[in-house]
Amino acid sequence: MKPIAIFQHEADTPPGYFATWLAQEGLPYTVVRLDAGDPVPQHAADFAGLCFMGGAMSVNDRLAFIEPECALIRAADAAGVPVIGHCLGGQLIAKALGAPVVRHTLKEIGWQPLYPSDPALAQEWLGPEVPERLETFQWHGDTFALPPGARNFLSSPLCANQAYVIDRGTYAHLGMQFHCEMTPELVRDRSRSGAEEIALERQAGRAAGVQAPAEICRNVEQRAAQLNRWAARLYARWVRGLKG
């Protein structure tokens, strides 16, 4: 099988549990370190699937790799190659396929609840016993509209579009606003490196969706384990459409 290409935008946003899950399933992958200067590949058909990770930047920033990534996503869509995106990655898919990505009125940082907005679609991607409330990890200040043909199936009280599917029949693209790839170590590292951002948001009176570092790290082993259980179901559904 061809490898899955994973696009990493920053040193502290690695593929985390996604890479662990792929290895457990015996699925080959390669990491494109955009933060280290790796070029964006030109041919989507060289890969079984594409995965885009998060990052502190915006898809609207004038960075050298943004438009090549968007072009690769469009090429993947045309070639029948499924794409999955985590946070910034979900925004990249939305932008590439024709939806606006804008600055949100507030940030979501930390553990936040999500609720199924399309129960039937949520069951398809998360299993028949999907609960009424899921806890997921968030760290974003932008939000996306839905691209043509997309269906959203998870929402939060602070940000409506949290997980969408573009079903192409034999494969599907999955865009997520949240981070289901987080491990306990990544959560702890992010809470430390982002402590100043958290403090600024809370001091400015924008604390509605922003948790303090101590709360982010509370029961992190159990929270991350449950998060990864949901991630495994999402990933298992997505890889059903891998090409070659």
Segments from the language model and where they lie:
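Catalytic nucleophile loop
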Residues: A76-P100
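Pocket-forming structural segment of enzyme catalytic cores
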Residues: L97-E185
